[in-house]
């Protein structure tokens, strides 16, 4: 327990360092720009899982631009909904809305503008399915997670995680006009990855959530139960990630081989946290790696669609066939 007390200040500074060290303009801060790159990475991952990869430059730009604006709008609306809650937590009281650096009216107008431009980009430059899915992601984040589930249940992120899992569907729809098996697989992977990722962060910030009555799992059930839940979802993530071998049109063997060290590190950190659930250092390490893990998965999906990966796949298949004959 001494470790917990000693590392609380360090953890808050390290996990969300930029909020303390780099002050973003108020209008940009409410858009939560640090969340957008990972959402766009999973969008690209969804594209790479289809026969439509690679996309033309205009379609790619419209998809990523529309997705970024839809994500920004969701971030602003989330900040608007939670401005009173943010004002009651030390960690968030300095944010643009509770501190008065940005008016709610200005923020709301900005959110509507981002939503409209995102919809226009996606409808005109991509297709209606991609546009509809982006708006579904926005609504599910603001209404399903933020407004309905977050203040009411410890399983808020399990169900509400659907919002963060929609970008792969957008990517698949942008590439082919339909979702397909690969898009649904990456959607499912992000869904099972999300609880382990978010609960690691919630372990670090549980006293903030406790102070304002948000029923996050670490607050209600404690670190031991949370670490067990993280372990279950961590294993589910590892097992499901392997199905990317089948979901990829080409390069599946390359993906499977390169995936091994990612999964090994994830399980190592999950087990370390399970062995010492009170360690904020362990929770912080898992939280950070979980972000790199999902970025890495998406990068592997893209690399697996390269000519080099396809060639390596053919070489490995030929080698396996020779071994089976011998």
From Swiss-Prot:
* GO CC terms of this entry: plasma membrane
Purpose of the protein: Converts heme B (protoheme IX) to heme O by substitution of the vinyl group on carbon 2 of heme B porphyrin ring with a hydroxyethyl farnesyl side group.
Gene Ontology molecular functions? protoheme IX farnesyltransferase activity
Q: What is this protein called?
A: Protoheme IX farnesyltransferase
What membrane topology is annotated for this entry?
Multi-pass membrane protein
Q: What is its main location?
A: membrane
Check the record and name the InterPro entries matching this protein.
Protohaem_IX_farnesylTrfase, UbiA_prenyltransferase, UbiA_prenylTrfase_CS, UbiA_sf
Q: Which Pfam families does the UniProt entry name for this protein?
A: UbiA
Organism lineage reads as: Bacteria, Bacillati, Cyanobacteriota, Cyanophyceae, Synechococcales
Primary gene name:
ctaB
NCBIfam families xrefs: cyoE_ctaB, PRK04375.1-2
Transmembrane parts of this sequence:
35-55, 60-80, 106-126, 129-149, 157-177, 185-205, 238-258, 289-309
